[in-house]
UniProtKB/Swiss-Prot annotation:
PROSITE patterns: ABM. This is Signal transduction protein TRAP. Contributes to virulence and biofilm formation. Up-expressed in ATCC 35984 compared with ATCC 12228. The gene is traP. Its main location: membrane. Residues 66-157 form the ABM domain. The modification Phosphohistidine is found at H65, H78, H153. It comes from Staphylococcus epidermidis (strain ATCC 35984 / DSM 28319 / BCRC 17069 / CCUG 31568 / BM 3577 / RP62A). Belongs to the TRAP family.
Length: 167
């Protein structure tokens, strides 16, 4: 499974979504633009998307949920260690109130992994983010040992994706 992402204006991305209703397309609002995501076993219908292989997955994407996309930089010599760390987090995320979905994404190009957490709303996500589970497994401090030299060129950061009707 692959996840493709592309940013643009609401109107432009919404037209793509309307023209391809047979595809698994999800549109969200960010602080400064809109984003469209496509989950697919095959090639994307998006023209120039960022492409990721889904290497771990729980739950289904839904446009009515709040998402946090965490960008985790790494280097070639730390990739396997980072993947091993994130693939072996043995925590039932569904135990957290409002949890909806999770995706661990490996880049098809470049060295920045992404982690998507889907929750019913931002408050539920912020509660999860304050937990020991998040701080020990997904926080910048927990993952910084895997950044390698690439940490000088790209940063660990979060981007919030809001349901269109809520933002």
């Amino acid at each position: 499974m692959y996840l493709y992402t592309s940013y643009g204006t609401y109107q432009f991305l919404n037209q793509i979504k309307l023209n391809h209703q047979e595809r698994s397309l999800f549109q969200f609002s960010t602080n400064d633009s809109s984003i469209i995501l496509e989950e697919s076993e095959g090639k994307s219908i998006l023209k120039h998307p960022s492409s990721y292989q889904v290497i771990d997955s729980t739950g289904e994407f839904n446009e009515h949920h709040f998402y946090s996309a965490i960008f985790v930089p790494t280097s070639e010599d730390h990739r396997q260690q980072l993947e091993k760390k994130l693939l072996h987090v043995d925590v039932p995320l569904s135990n957290f109130g409002g949890f909806k979905s999770y995706r661990l994404l490996k880049p098809t190009e470049g060295s920045t992994y992404k982690i998507y957490f889907g929750f019913a709303n931002r408050t539920a996500y912020e509660d999860f983010k304050a937990s020991d589970i998040f701080n020990e497994n997904f926080s910048k401090d927990a993952l910084s040992q895997y950044f390698g030299a690439s940490g000088q060129h790209s940063s660990y950061f979060e981007r919030y994706l809001y349901p269109i009707e809520d933002h």
